[in-house]
């Protein structure tokens, strides 16, 4: 996960829409190297026409007494008069003596966009004598993205209020005349307040939804040829393509390319997703034999794959999804030092996979389960002395599930815990459960990709996202798996340490991201390694 933070100067004058002057942008808590007017995408839930804020008693809502939670307080519960996915259900906590709203809790579900549901907590305070307004807002959201369903938290804090200041107009004029980024908060949501050629500013009709970045990526993987590769790349993303709520993400780096798209309610009530990727760098896959990584029987592999998925929210955080994937594997001779003379390569070709998945996400708790079935090309591979056949004519199955928890221990300090199990049937060396590499069934940091071939994997992970300051954001995870090897049916333990860090941008770059894994323990000799990437990004 990650977070995007902003610091604004907020200008509000009676009878006018509020204006915000962007002072700072933080990627994962680290200050980004941005100057001038740089507009990042705005992702918000659909706005409601009428909000039950501060006891406005809007006619679209029905109100009822919720009793006294503590002496001197009263709960006022509200719900929409008629069904409306954009309307809120919730409660206001009111001070009985003054009639002031102290706290507001509200939520919406089944929203028709990227944000599928949200739960908000608004805290009110007296910012000046007789002036009562929100001072803090926390929002918990469920998004449908190109990578699936994810949980997002927003936190807004208002402080250092200056009311009826003598220099308000001068400060506002200075903000408008500056070259910095500004926004206006309109009834339809936040819109960029763009500087024009004559020095004036204009409200953009639509919310900014797209962005681009140039990337310099260094890949580290001992299975690649070469094991360290520096790649230039271009990133493009849009959260409202064609104005229809379509999400698009794409990365092209020459030898590695990936793209994905998601269309909320793209087919009736079903969310549609699609993705494609291709790796043109050859990896050399070496088998595990008798509990250690072999220096023989190495096979080179390149691949490309596409996938299509359908999903539907069932309410209360439950969701069901189905997808189909097509992957083309091109096998060739591996690195020279790992080749075995006379080794027959496995059959290249198309592998088809269908998967059904159910999930539940609620207030940081996560549960997932899946069942998949597929077919790969038939054939044989190996040496004359030890020939191997693709089992069951290429038909195979896989299944598994996991439980997880994300919890903010204190502001900015996040805990993640996860445990799960994955299994299957009719696997072989070139179609099995892997625990290394980004595309593996279970990813354990610091384990070589496509080295361990297993038919059962049980795993557990724990991690902390540590707010170390504006110049560093550090996430550390400890990961362990117990795998049953196809080679001999024995179970082996593997452990790795993941380290993800964000650093402030420098020179021409906006931000720096480091994601590396180090293998710290393995019952299988030779499969631990240093792997991951370092990315330098320039947003424009």
Predicted regions span which residues?
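Short, hydrophobic/aromatic-rich segments at coil-to-beta transitions
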Residues: 70-77, 100-105, 131-138, 212-213, ...
């Amino acid at each position: 996960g990650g977070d995007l933070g902003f610091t604004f100067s907020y200008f509000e004058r009676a009878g006018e829409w509020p204006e915000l002057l962007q002072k700072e942008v933080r990627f994962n808590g680290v200050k980004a190297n941005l100057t001038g007017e740089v507009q990042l995408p705005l992702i918000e839930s659909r706005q409601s026409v009428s909000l039950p804020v501060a006891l406005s008693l809007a006619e679209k809502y029905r109100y009822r007494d919720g009793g006294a939670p503590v002496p001197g307080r009263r709960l006022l519960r509200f719900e929409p008069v008629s069904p409306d996915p954009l309307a809120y259900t919730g409660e206001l906590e009111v001070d009985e003596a003054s009639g002031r709203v102290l706290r507001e809790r509200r939520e919406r579900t089944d929203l028709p966009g990227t944000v599928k549901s949200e739960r908000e907590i608004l805290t009110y305070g007296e910012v000046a004598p007789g002036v009562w307004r929100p001072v803090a807002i926390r929002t918990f959201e469920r998004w449908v993205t190109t990578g699936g369903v994810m949980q997002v938290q927003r936190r807004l804090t208002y402080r250092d209020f200056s009311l009826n200041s003598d220099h308000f107009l001068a400060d506002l004029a200075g903000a408008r005349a500056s070259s910095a980024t500004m926004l206006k908060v309109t009834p339809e949501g936040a819109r960029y307040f763009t500087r024009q050629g004559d020095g004036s500013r204009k409200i953009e009709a639509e919310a900014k939804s797209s962005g681009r970045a140039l990337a310099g990526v260094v890949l580290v993987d001992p299975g690649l040829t070469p094991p360290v590769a520096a790649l230039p790349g271009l990133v493009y993303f849009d959260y409202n393509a064609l104005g229809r709520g379509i999400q698009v993400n794409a990365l092209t780096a020459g030898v590695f390319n990936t793209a994905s798209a998601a269309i909320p309610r793209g087919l009736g009530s079903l969310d549609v997703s699609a993705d494609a990727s291709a790796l043109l760098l050859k990896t050399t896959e070496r088998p595990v034999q008798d509990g250690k990584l072999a220096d023989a029987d190495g096979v080179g592999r390149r691949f490309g794959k596409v996938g299509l998925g359908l999903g539907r929210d069932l309410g209360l955080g439950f969701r069901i999804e189905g997808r189909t994937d097509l992957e083309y594997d091109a096998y060739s001779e591996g690195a020279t030092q790992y080749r075995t003379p006379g080794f027959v390569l496995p059959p290249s070709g198309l592998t088809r996979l269908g998967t059904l998945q159910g999930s539940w996400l609620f207030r940081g708790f996560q549960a997932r389960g899946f069942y998949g079935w597929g077919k790969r090309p038939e054939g044989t591979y190996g040496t004359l002395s030890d020939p191997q056949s693709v089992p069951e004519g290429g038909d195979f199955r896989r299944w598994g599930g996991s439980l997880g928890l994300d919890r903010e221990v204190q502001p900015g300090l996040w805990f993640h815990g996860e445990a799960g199990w994955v299994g299957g049937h009719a696997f072989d060396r070139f179609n099995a459960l892997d625990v290394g590499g980004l595309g593996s069934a279970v990813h354990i940091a610091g384990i070589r990709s496509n080295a361990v071939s297993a038919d059962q994997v049980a795993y557990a992970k724990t991690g902390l996202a540590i707010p170390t300051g504006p110049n560093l954001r550090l996430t550390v995870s400890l990961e362990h798996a117990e795998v049953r090897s196809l080679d001999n049916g024995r179970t082996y333990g593997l452990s790795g340490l993941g380290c993800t860090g964000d650093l402030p941008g420098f020179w021409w770059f906006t931000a720096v991201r480091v994601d590396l894994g180090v293998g710290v323990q393995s019952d299988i000799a030779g499969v631990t390694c240093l792997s991951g990437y370092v990315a330098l990004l320039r947003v424009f």
